Structure formats: C-alpha cells, structure tokens
Amino acid sequence: MKNRKYDLAAFMMAVLVGAAVLFGCGESSGAVSKEEPLTVYLWENSLIKNLVPYIHEQLPDQDIEFIVGNNDTDLYSYMEEHGELPDVITVRRFSGTDAQDLQPYLMDFCGYDVVSRYYSYALQYYKNSDNEIQWLPVCGLPQTIIANKTLFDQYGIKIPSNYQEYAEACQQFYENGIKPYSLDLAEDWSAHEVIQAGAIGEFTSLDGIEWRSGAETSSREVKFDDGLWKRIFSETSRFLKDSHLGKDDILVNADIAYQTFVEGKAAMFHGYPALMQQLQTQMDAQLICIPYFSQTSEEAFVYMTPSLNIAFNKDLEKDQEKLETALDVLDCMISEEGQRLIANGRCVISLNTNVPTMMQDISGLEDEMKSNSIYIRYSAQKSFSASLEAIHGLLSGEMDEAQAYDAFRSAMNAEDTEEKAVVNFDREYSIALNDKNGRDAASSILTTVRVENNAQLAIAPYYYFTASIYRGECTSSRVALMTAKSSDTSLYFAKINGEQVWKLVENYLDHTEDEFSITNKYELPILSGMKITVQKEENGFLLKDIAVDQEKIDKEKEYSILLTDDTRSILEKTTPGCRIKRLPDMTLSSAWTAFMEKGQQPLAPEDYIEVEK
C-alpha cells in the first residue's frame, strides 16, 4: 500500500525546496471494502464514455461505481442532507463560496502528497477559510479567441499581439462589412467570459487576486472593491464597444454565433481548442488562437476553465483501503492519458508538474503557455446570471458602466429566494443497485416519464439518473437534479415489433460507442415496461430473455417505445428506416420535473432486470 499521507510541515518544506513526489496511475494499491463499492460521481456523461474505461483498465481489481452527477454542488448538498454523500464528487462550475455547506464533510488534501504535484498558481484560489484544500482542479481547458487567419490575410489585417491592435483589427473588419467578433451573448457563460476576459488585466492584478481570494472564501456577502470593479466594468464596456458588439447580440445564441463564423461572416469566435479543430474541418480557412489582452499593459493571458474539480468525502479517511482506491482513481485522472481523455483530445493545460501540457497542435498561445500566463475562471454559480444581467444591460443601453456594476454586485449578494416544495414524496427509492442489479430510483423516474408519454416500453442508459428519491418535501430544482440535467437527453417515440425490441436491447448490451461498452453490473441499462434476463460473461453481458407483462415478448407484436439520444441512435442502426419521432420541447429532465411539479407521486419502480451468473 502506498504511503501517501505526510504531515503539513514536511509538505511545506518539500514545496520550499521544490521537491515533488511522482506516482503513476497503473499500479493498484488494494481492493475496495467488500461491503460497498467506491462511488465516484462524474459531472457529465462524456466522462463515463471517455475516462471510465481507462480507469477500469488501470484498476481492474477494484470495485468502483461511476455515476453521472450534475454541474451543481447543490446535488451533493441534497445527498449529504440524507446521509448519502458519495465518496468522490466532481463539478466544473465551482467556487469555494458555493461549496461551503459541504465543507464539514469533505477531506483536506493538504496532508496528502498529491498536492505537491500541482503548480502553485493552480491552487491559489482553492484554500478555504480554514486554510484547507478540499477541492482539486483536474487539468484545464483553454478558452480563447479563435481567429480566421485567412480572413485577416485577405483584408491585410495584422493578427493582434496586444489590446490596441485587437481594437484596431475589429475596426478594420467593421469598416469592411465583416463582423469582427461573433459572440453568443444570449448564453450566460459567454456574458460571464466577457467580463473576466475583457478586463483580464484587472483580474490578474494584485487587487484582482486579493478580491478573488476573499470572494472564494466568503461565507456571507461577497465584498467588492469599488475602485477595482469600476475599472473592470469600464474595461468591459470598452471591450464590447471595441468589438462592435451591440443590442442585436443579446439574442445571439451559440448556434447562431457558430454559424456566422463558419460562413466567414465574422473574423473571430471563441472556444476550446477542440472546437477550433472541429471548425477547421468545416471551414476552408486557416484558424489560429488568440489570447485575451490586458487593457492596462502589454500582457496577454490564456483564459482557462478547469475541466473538472474533485473532492473526497471525509469519511474515506475511516476506511484506508477505500481511500487508497480513491487516490488511485485521482492518480488516473491526473495522469497524462487521463487528462487527455477528460479533455476529449490533446489540447489540455496540465496543472501538474509531472505531466506536460498538451497543446502541440494549437498555434497562437506559445508565449503565454511558456510563461504560465494563465487565468483560472471565477465560477461562482451566481456570477453567471449576474454577468448576463450586467452585459445585457450594457448592450441594450439600459445601463451605463456604474449601473451595470451595481446590478452585478446586487445579483451576487442577493439572498436566495426560498424555493417552495412542489411534491411531498411518500416513499423513498435508492439510486444504488438493488439485489437484482436494478436501480429503483431510476426505474421510478423512467416508468413515470414512460407512462406520462403513453409508451408501452422504455430503455435508457444508466448515466441519465443521478440521485435517490428521498421521502419528504422536495423543490423543483432538486427534483431536476435526480436526472443528469447537465448531460440531458431528448426523448423519442417509436413503434417497433418484438423482434426489433430484442435487437435493440441485444445491441445495446454489445454496443461500443466512443470506446464505451457495458463491462460491469453498474453500467447496465434502465428499462421500463419490460424485464430482461442477462447472463454475465467475461467481457460483458448476453441477453437471454425479454418479458412483457410477465410473458415472453411477442416477436410479431408491435410495441410503442420511449428512447433517449443513445438508444435512438442504436435503433437507427438495428432497424434502418424505422420512423422515430422526437418529442417536441421535452427532455428526460424536463419531463420528469414537469410531472413532479403537478404534485403527484412517481410511479413505483419495476422489477426490470435479472442477472444470471
């Protein structure tokens, strides 16, 4: 077993002398306690498809259950209130303020050597008010301006290397009838980015760093430095004007902004390098990344979003074997291959001293990467809606800089409105596997949505269901968190015969998509209106039987079936030409939430699966 813990004094001395203890991912340090698996919640389902197979490959003898959560720490607060905080939790949108109610229940990483493998800048905002590090970022994704270099060259416009040149380039494109910057300002994340990236010189100044440190550890009202924030909104306003962004851009969503850039009607867009590579395949143009420029100096910075932030349940320290397994999982995540898989490509900023940054195919950021000129996004939940309100006020002309700052500050410090309960659950259903390898909470949710949409059958991947249904009153927002809202799926309706149902289920069990396939009991699908019997084999599961109404499925009979994005895709392959109808304005999460908002009880879970050994 690896000795991963050491006292804080020794750790600080190691940091001072520049020592770092390096560990690989592949060596397993011990099995999980036999009673229960290690539960790891990943904030979106792409991580289930990309990362989980790699971790299982590295740690084949360890009992680990991966479940998709949500990009919201309130999910984990809800689970903790009912005594079910998972062993390992992750989110992308994160600030210390949002996670304060979890602070008593999370482990401090400061006593473990994993902290010594991080660059100091990566952890500067991760210490809480007790000087503990309870969350760690796992690799970063650079969010930059994406420039159409071919368009720049066509009009003889220089690729900017400072803010003044950026403003001049925007003006030249505007005079030539080309939109300088296509930005999806209908989206909260883009409004959020404009404030921090447009005034990035202020956020990276000593005043900005001091404010950020205080904001991350604030337990109540976030204090604002008026001098700093007046400068921030002055520079934000200037950035919007210099970029020729105005009232019409309030309604520009991600699809519109993307298409405008693809069609060559705009010179610049924004996004991660992986998006730039995707754009490159669609455009007959050379693309290049541009960093965000300080308006107060010649400096430029890469605006970075951690791909995920991870925390451990404090109770892990009471079970050394389970803790070692959790640390093994973390080792896998921060390994070179783990970071590449998390970032879904090669373009990733490593935050760890023993793993190189992987930006080989991206040009335009070389100087900033070499000098570690990286700004980590501030991501308090309230800051997104606050940014949207302030930016829309500036764009519409309804607010000047001072009013926009006042609106932002007020929104950040507004007291949370007490949300009223919409349903009082009279029963409790667990998301954990039952003794037949089914998930009662997931079954209840899927069955409720199926019946509400008048379908006889339904099949869905397990990773669309996140939390137990707890007895008692529940608000609408927490009802929504019982499904993977951050990785939601559309719903589809089809009519197929029993033989086609068999092929659909059989192929789902065999299906490999993006290197993800069902290899263990935790990954089995959720079904409703039917019961399947499967046999465990060395590399997966074999379908043995399907029963409907306790009788073997009729291969000739037609059945209506409710599908998700993934199961629809499989049906299109197994039954080409099958008519599949997308249910309008409906997702799994919205359908479930809407039904519960009526105040009715969910339907009981079904006995939908049996695993033969």
Where are these regions (language model features)?
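Extracytoplasmic/periplasmic substrate-recognition and gating elements
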Residues: E57, Q280-N344
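Hinge/lid segment of periplasmic solute-binding proteins
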Residues: R92-T144, K158, E193-V194, I288-I290
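Conserved N-terminal structural module of periplasmic/extracytoplasmic solute-binding proteins
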Residues: A19-G96, I159, Q403
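Extracytoplasmic/periplasmic solute-binding protein
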Residues: Q134-P137, A167-E221
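Glycine-centered hinge/linker elements that transmit conformational signals in sensory
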Residues: G214-I250
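Catalytic centers of hydrolytic enzymes
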Residues: E418-K613
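A structural signal for short loop-to-beta-strand junctions that line the ligand-binding cleft
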Residues: Y78, P86-D87, V115-T150, K179-E187, ...
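C-terminal capping/gating helix-and-loop segments adjacent to ligand/active sites or protein-protein/ligand interfaces
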Residues: S46-L47, E65, M304, A343-T417
